[in-house]
Structures are given as structure tokens and as C-alpha cells.
Amino acid sequence: MAREFSRTDRVGQQIHKEIASILQNEFKNRDPRLGMVTVSAVEVSRDLAYTKIYVTFFENDEEVMDNYLSILEENKGYIRTLLANRMRMRAVPAIKFVRDGSLSEGIRISNLVDETLNKDKERARNAGRSLDEDEQED
């Protein structure tokens, strides 16, 4: 009978949970410069030696987000030590923090869609008809 999840998936889920907790609770006391950060995904290598931790920041300023990412990178040894204290593994994977751009990209696409819909409504209004009338004719 095949397992539902591989070992790397299970370790990745546990690392995701523990890192999120560490960043929200313990790390805030060590470095208060770090703003609101969320762990969005974790990728673990097949040999469990390396892990990429994708993080999202609730900021719009690129410079501030880069600063937050550098704070995490500077303290990844400390974070790895905290992770080792929480997990039962012979060797805890080396950590690399990566900024997850999916949230900002999703917001950008949503804004483009809204902008396009507003332009379509404006064109329909200028042509003397509403967009709702066009949809009812189809």
C-alpha cells in the first residue's frame, strides 16, 4: 500500500508549521524590526538537506520587503537552531528564505481586470448603452 504523502512532504509541512510559529512568537522578541510576515510555502529537497521557505510580507514598498528578507537571511542560523529544538531530526535542513511574489502578482492581475472592466463600462456608457444590456442580448 502506497503512502499518501512522501517523507519530504511530511517534513515540509512540519517545517512550515514550526517556522510560522517561530516567526510569529519567538523571533519577534529578538528582532522587532521585522514586520508582519507569513510563511506561504516550504520546499524541502529530496535528501532533506535544504529547504526553501517562501514568505509573504504585508507591505507595498519593495525596499522595505527587501530589508525584511535580509533580516530573515541574517538570522537564519538562529531560526534554524530554534527549528532544531522543536523537531526530532538527525539533521535540520539548511534554510533559504525566498520572497513569495504570488500575492502581489495576484493583486496586480486583479487590479488589471478591474481596470479593464471599468474601461469597458465607460466605453459602453459613451456609446449610449449599458454593459448589462449587451450581456442580456447574448
Curated annotation (Swiss-Prot):
Keyword field: Cytoplasm, Ribosome biogenesis
GO CC aspect terms: cytosol
Location(s) in or outside the cell: Cytoplasm
GO MF annotation, one: ribosomal small subunit binding
Transmembrane segments: none
BP terms from Gene Ontology: maturation of SSU-rRNA
Main location: cytoplasm
Key word Oxidoreductase present: no
Gene3D superfamilies: 3.30.300.20
PANTHER family registered for this protein in UniProt: RIBOSOME-BINDING FACTOR A, CHLOROPLASTIC-RELATED (PTHR33515:SF1)
HAMAP family recorded: RbfA
UniProt record similarity statement: Belongs to the RbfA family.
UniProt function note: One of several proteins that assist in the late maturation steps of the functional core of the 30S ribosomal subunit. Associates with free 30S ribosomal subunits (but not with 30S subunits that are part of 70S ribosomes or polysomes). Required for efficient processing of 16S rRNA. May interact with the 5'-terminal helix region of 16S rRNA.
Complex and partners: Monomer. Binds 30S ribosomal subunits, but not 50S ribosomal subunits or 70S ribosomes.
Name listed for the protein in its UniProt record: Ribosome-binding factor A
Lineage: Bacteria, Pseudomonadati, Pseudomonadota, Gammaproteobacteria, Alteromonadales
